[in-house]
Amino acid sequence: MNPRPRKLKVLRWVPNRWVLTRGARRERVLHLTFDDGPHPEHTPALLDLLAAHGAKATFFLIGREAERYPDVVERIVREGHVLGNHSWSHPQFDRLDLAAQREEIQRTDRLLTRFDGAARHDFRPPRGVLPRPMVLDCVRRGQRIAYWSYDSLDYSKRPAEILIASAQRYPPEPGEILLMHDDSALSLQLLQTMLPAWAAGGFVFEPLRPSA
């Protein structure tokens, strides 16, 4: 259960201003990121845990779910976390043409702007799929793609004990961007153990810094 995605072998050659794969290695910071929310039960529970540890994160939201649960999105922003774009409907991006991909992204940005006032948000493609035309289109429009360097594997539906054991065996390094999901309880169960452990190791938890 190696937490580092294979795509990093290729993505490390792509400028970070186009596809962000990790933060600064010199800082003892971890970047917690959560995909597929907001969820009416799991996201608030996760926000409670983050608040208890003074941790800030980035939430890559599905547009239609953000529209469905605006109160949860408002709380995310109010508590100092950062919103990211995870498409409108979480489709299989490599099955869409470029115009449809762009609409998935821009429709979500328009909605998120109503919550945080930001004109543009970091985009994380569903399932990490990176069609080349989409990447080039994002570069042309100045929209950064945010990938990850450390995969919690919480979507694998393995028991939390196995995910915790993997996180302990393969500890994250400074600047890592951690991939998690807030559409189930697994990330919460993982972080209930690992947040205190990482904090005890001197880590602080910050959202991804917005692109220029």
Segments predicted by a language model, with ranges:
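Active-site beta->alpha N-cap acidic-glycine motif
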Residues: 2-96, 100, 104, 111, ...
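Extracellular/periplasmic catalytic domains that process cell-envelope and extracellular macromolecules
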Residues: 25-26, 170-173
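A cross-domain feature marking catalytic cores of carbohydrate-active enzymes
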Residues: 34-36, 61-63, 85-87, 125-127, ...
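Divalent metal-coordination and catalytic microenvironments
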Residues: 35, 50, 59, 83, ...
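Alpha-helix N-cap/loop-to-helix initiation residues
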Residues: 39-40, 65-66, 131, 184-187
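A short acidic, amphipathic alpha-helical/loop segment
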Residues: 45-46, 71-75, 133-137, 190-194
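His/Asp/Glu-enriched short active-site or ligand-binding loop at hydrolase and phosphoryl-transfer sites
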Residues: 129-171, 203-212
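Catalytic grooves of carbohydrate-active enzymes
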Residues: 173-211
